[in-house]
Protein backbone atom coordinates (compact mmCIF):
# COMPACT_ATOMS: atom_id res chain seq x y z
CA UNK A 1 0.00 0.00 0.00
CA UNK A 2 1.24 3.43 -0.86
CA UNK A 3 -0.10 6.89 -0.33
CA UNK A 4 0.92 8.63 -3.53
CA UNK A 5 1.89 12.21 -4.22
CA UNK A 6 -1.71 12.80 -5.34
CA UNK A 7 -3.06 12.08 -1.88
CA UNK A 8 -0.34 13.99 -0.05
CA UNK A 9 -0.65 17.05 -2.29
CA UNK A 10 -4.45 16.97 -2.09
CA UNK A 11 -4.34 17.05 1.72
CA UNK A 12 -1.72 19.83 1.68
CA UNK A 13 -3.70 21.90 -0.83
CA UNK A 14 -6.96 21.43 1.09
CA UNK A 15 -5.26 22.53 4.31
CA UNK A 16 -3.90 25.60 2.54
CA UNK A 17 -7.37 26.35 1.18
CA UNK A 18 -8.95 25.97 4.62
CA UNK A 19 -6.34 28.23 6.23
CA UNK A 20 -6.67 30.96 3.60
CA UNK A 21 -10.38 30.90 2.76
CA UNK A 22 -11.45 33.46 5.38
CA UNK A 23 -10.88 36.26 2.87
CA UNK A 24 -12.89 34.57 0.11
CA UNK A 25 -12.09 32.30 -2.79
CA UNK A 26 -8.49 31.13 -3.06
CA UNK A 27 -6.74 30.96 -6.41
CA UNK A 28 -4.90 27.77 -7.28
CA UNK A 29 -1.93 29.89 -8.36
CA UNK A 30 -1.64 31.15 -4.76
CA UNK A 31 -1.74 27.61 -3.36
CA UNK A 32 0.79 26.57 -6.01
CA UNK A 33 3.17 29.32 -4.95
CA UNK A 34 2.79 28.79 -1.19
CA UNK A 35 3.04 24.98 -1.32
CA UNK A 36 5.41 24.58 -4.26
CA UNK A 37 2.99 22.33 -6.15
CA UNK A 38 2.69 22.75 -9.91
CA UNK A 39 -0.40 24.64 -11.04
CA UNK A 40 -1.33 22.02 -13.64
CA UNK A 41 -1.14 19.29 -10.99
CA UNK A 42 -3.38 21.32 -8.67
CA UNK A 43 -5.88 21.83 -11.49
CA UNK A 44 -6.14 18.06 -11.93
CA UNK A 45 -6.48 17.47 -8.18
CA UNK A 46 -9.09 20.18 -7.71
CA UNK A 47 -11.14 18.72 -10.55
CA UNK A 48 -11.32 15.49 -8.55
CA UNK A 49 -11.98 17.32 -5.27
CA UNK A 50 -14.78 19.32 -6.93
CA UNK A 51 -16.39 16.18 -8.39
CA UNK A 52 -16.24 14.62 -4.90
CA UNK A 53 -18.13 17.62 -3.49
CA UNK A 54 -15.29 18.80 -1.25
CA UNK A 55 -14.65 22.15 -2.96
CA UNK A 56 -16.61 24.61 -5.07
CA UNK A 57 -15.19 26.74 -7.84
CA UNK A 58 -16.16 30.38 -8.22
CA UNK A 59 -15.72 32.03 -11.60
CA UNK A 60 -15.00 35.60 -12.54
CA UNK A 61 -12.98 38.35 -10.87
CA UNK A 62 -12.04 37.27 -7.38
CA UNK A 63 -12.81 33.69 -8.35
CA UNK A 64 -11.04 30.61 -7.15
CA UNK A 65 -11.95 27.79 -4.81
CA UNK A 66 -13.73 27.54 -1.48
CA UNK A 67 -14.44 24.57 0.76
CA UNK A 68 -17.85 23.02 0.07
CA UNK A 69 -18.36 22.41 3.81
CA UNK A 70 -16.81 23.75 7.02
CA UNK A 71 -13.26 22.52 7.69
CA UNK A 72 -14.59 20.67 10.75
CA UNK A 73 -16.74 18.50 8.47
CA UNK A 74 -14.09 17.53 5.91
CA UNK A 75 -11.87 14.67 6.98
CA UNK A 76 -8.61 13.43 5.54
CA UNK A 77 -10.11 10.09 4.44
CA UNK A 78 -12.55 11.98 2.19
CA UNK A 79 -9.74 13.99 0.61
CA UNK A 80 -7.56 10.96 -0.03
CA UNK A 81 -10.51 8.97 -1.42
CA UNK A 82 -11.21 11.80 -3.87
CA UNK A 83 -7.58 12.14 -4.99
CA UNK A 84 -6.35 8.55 -5.02
CA UNK A 85 -7.65 5.86 -7.28
CA UNK A 86 -7.35 3.43 -4.38
CA UNK A 87 -5.66 3.25 -1.00
CA UNK A 88 -5.71 -0.42 -0.14
CA UNK A 89 -3.27 -2.74 1.62
CA UNK A 90 -4.71 -5.91 0.10
CA UNK A 91 -3.29 -7.44 -3.05
CA UNK A 92 -6.76 -8.24 -4.38
CA UNK A 93 -8.36 -4.83 -3.94
CA UNK A 94 -10.48 -6.15 -1.05
CA UNK A 95 -12.22 -8.67 -3.32
CA UNK A 96 -10.98 -11.69 -1.30
CA UNK A 97 -9.96 -13.53 -4.47
CA UNK A 98 -6.20 -13.18 -4.13
CA UNK A 99 -5.38 -16.88 -3.81
CA UNK A 100 -6.82 -18.72 -6.80
CA UNK A 101 -10.24 -17.18 -6.27
CA UNK A 102 -10.18 -17.46 -2.46
CA UNK A 103 -8.83 -15.17 0.25
CA UNK A 104 -5.11 -15.56 0.92
CA UNK A 105 -3.81 -16.41 4.40
CA UNK A 106 -3.14 -12.77 5.27
CA UNK A 107 -6.25 -11.23 3.70
CA UNK A 108 -7.93 -10.43 7.03
CA UNK A 109 -4.72 -8.85 8.34
CA UNK A 110 -4.60 -6.40 5.41
CA UNK A 111 -8.34 -5.76 5.57
CA UNK A 112 -8.02 -4.86 9.26
CA UNK A 113 -5.13 -2.53 8.40
CA UNK A 114 -7.32 -0.85 5.77
CA UNK A 115 -10.07 -0.35 8.35
CA UNK A 116 -7.67 1.03 10.96
CA UNK A 117 -6.15 3.49 8.49
CA UNK A 118 -9.58 4.59 7.25
CA UNK A 119 -10.88 4.98 10.81
CA UNK A 120 -7.89 7.12 11.74
CA UNK A 121 -7.97 9.29 8.62
CA UNK A 122 -11.74 9.64 9.00
CA UNK A 123 -11.26 10.95 12.54
CA UNK A 124 -8.86 13.73 11.48
CA UNK A 125 -10.52 16.84 10.06
CA UNK A 126 -8.97 19.83 8.36
CA UNK A 127 -10.08 21.89 11.35
CA UNK A 128 -8.38 19.59 13.87
CA UNK A 129 -5.07 19.90 12.00
CA UNK A 130 -5.39 23.69 11.78
CA UNK A 131 -6.20 23.97 15.49
CA UNK A 132 -3.23 21.85 16.50
CA UNK A 133 -0.96 23.80 14.20
CA UNK A 134 -2.24 27.08 15.67
CA UNK A 135 -1.74 25.75 19.20
CA UNK A 136 1.87 24.92 18.39
CA UNK A 137 1.37 21.17 18.70
CA UNK A 138 2.49 20.16 15.24
CA UNK A 139 4.45 17.20 16.54
CA UNK A 140 1.38 15.01 16.69
CA UNK A 141 -1.62 15.67 14.48
CA UNK A 142 -4.18 13.51 16.24
CA UNK A 143 -3.38 10.76 18.65
CA UNK A 144 -4.93 7.48 17.59
CA UNK A 145 -5.65 5.36 20.63
CA UNK A 146 -8.29 2.92 19.42
CA UNK A 147 -6.78 -0.18 17.83
CA UNK A 148 -8.92 -3.25 17.22
Swiss-Prot record:
Keyword DNA-binding among record annotations:
yes
Q: Name one GO molecular function term.
A: double-stranded DNA binding
Keyword DNA-binding in annotation: yes
Q: Which residues form the HTH rrf2-type domain?
A: 2-131
* This protein's UniProt keywords: DNA-binding
Q: Which InterPro entries match?
A: TF_HTH_IscR, TR_Rrf2-type_CS, Tscrpt_reg_Rrf2, WH-like_DNA-bd_sf, WH_DNA-bd_sf
One GO biological-process annotation of the entry reads: regulation of DNA-templated transcription
* TM stretches of this protein: none
**Which Gene3D superfamilies does the UniProt record give?**
Winged helix-like DNA-binding domain superfamily/Winged helix DNA-binding domain (1.10.10.10)
Which cellular components does GO assign to this protein?
cytosol
**Record-given protein name:** Putative HTH-type transcriptional regulator NMB1378
| Protein source organism | Neisseria meningitidis serogroup B (strain ATCC BAA-335 / MC58)
Amino acid sequence: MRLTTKGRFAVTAMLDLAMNAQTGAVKLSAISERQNISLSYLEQLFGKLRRAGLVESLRGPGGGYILAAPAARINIAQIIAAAEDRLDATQCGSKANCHHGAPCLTHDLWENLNKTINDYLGSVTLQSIIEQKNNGDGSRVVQFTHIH
